[in-house]
Structures are given as structure tokens and as C-alpha cells.
């Protein structure tokens, strides 16, 4: 009988210990490869968003707002909730807000919209080089050098990465 109590107590202690440790993910250092991959994923999202998303046939709508031509974003990112969710795959909440502001994205008649323009990128993210500028436990600044097409030139950008317990490493700021 006494053996059963000790076994039961042991099982309860182990399960409590495992439960307590589950949500406590410690920040692991961000490797240069992980930093480059996250930046490349962000760049893909950025290009899609600044081009309005992936429009379906007949979905593209424009309007005049404060003397400028605007377009509604595609249906998969046409609400603040959808757009934020898409950006939060690679960015922090603060970074996503900054991105929307910097790119002139507004809410108009309950839909997200932006100034009408088209963007093309020749940045070759698959061969980007990464240099660590500053590192703390849950914040890192990396400088990425990304070649531009076949021009033999490159663009340097500073990425600030922040570790969030719930989501892991995310981009907080991009300086071009």
C-alpha cells in the first residue's frame, strides 16, 4: 500500500514538472542561416503585400482618397486582422504596425487599402550574407547584404530580430 502512494506521488510530481516547463521556451541564439531564412520569408510577404496581395479575377478595385489613387488589398489580406496575421508570420506586432504605416496602408470603408503602385524586386535572397551587429539574449541586430540581380551590386539592410516566447524569433524592424 505504501509503495502505491509513493508511486502515485512520483507520477504527480513528474506531471506537474512537465506541465510547468511546457510554456517556458528559452531564447536560443538566432543563427545566420535562420536570420537569412526569416528575412527571405519576410521579403516574399513584403513583395506580395506591397503589390496588393494575390487578386482573383474581378477583385481589383481602385478609388480616389485625398487626391491619390488607392487600391483595396486582395481578399486574403483585405481586413486588418487578416493582414496582421499574414505579417505576424515573420514580424512582431509592433513591426507589423510599422510596416503598414511605412507603406501607406489604410483602412477605408472597412477594408485595407494602399496607394496604387507596382513593385518588382531583383534581390537574390538565396545568396544573402549575414553579419551579426549586436546580440542580446532576446534581441539581435543583423546586417544582411543581398545581391541585386546580375548587376554585381548589393543592398545592405539592418534587421532587428526579437525573440517572443510564444512565436520564437520575429523581425521587429527593417532599416533599408
Give residue ranges: language-model regions.
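Surface-exposed, charged secondary-structure patches
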Residues: 106-149
Amino acid at each position: 500500500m505504501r509503495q502505491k502512494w509513493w508511486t502515485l506521488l512520483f507520477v504527480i510530481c513528474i506531471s506537474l514538472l512537465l506541465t510547468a516547463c511546457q510554456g517556458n521556451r528559452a531564447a536560443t541564439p538566432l543563427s545566420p542561416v535562420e536570420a537569412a531564412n526569416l528575412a527571405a520569408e519576410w521579403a516574399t510577404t513584403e513583395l506580395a503585400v506591397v503589390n496588393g496581395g494575390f487578386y482573383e479575377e474581378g477583385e481589383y478595385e481602385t478609388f480616389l482618397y485625398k487626391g491619390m489613387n488607392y487600391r483595396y488589398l486582395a481578399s486574403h489580406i483585405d481586413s486588418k486582422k487578416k493582414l496582421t496575421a499574414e505579417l505576424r508570420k515573420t514580424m512582431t506586432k509592433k513591426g507589423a504596425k510599422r510596416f503598414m504605416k511605412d507603406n501607406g496602408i489604410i483602412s477605408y470603408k472597412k477594408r485595407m487599402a494602399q496607394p496604387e503602385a507596382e513593385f518588382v524586386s531583383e534581390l537574390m535572397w538565396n545568396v544573402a550574407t549575414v553579419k551579426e551587429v549586436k546580440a542580446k539574449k532576446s534581441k539581435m541586430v543583423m546586417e544582411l547584404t543581398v545581391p541585386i540581380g546580375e548587376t554585381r551590386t548589393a543592398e545592405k539592410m539592418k534587421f532587428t530580430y526579437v525573440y517572443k516566447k510564444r512565436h520564437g524569433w520575429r523581425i521587429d524592424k527593417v532599416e533599408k
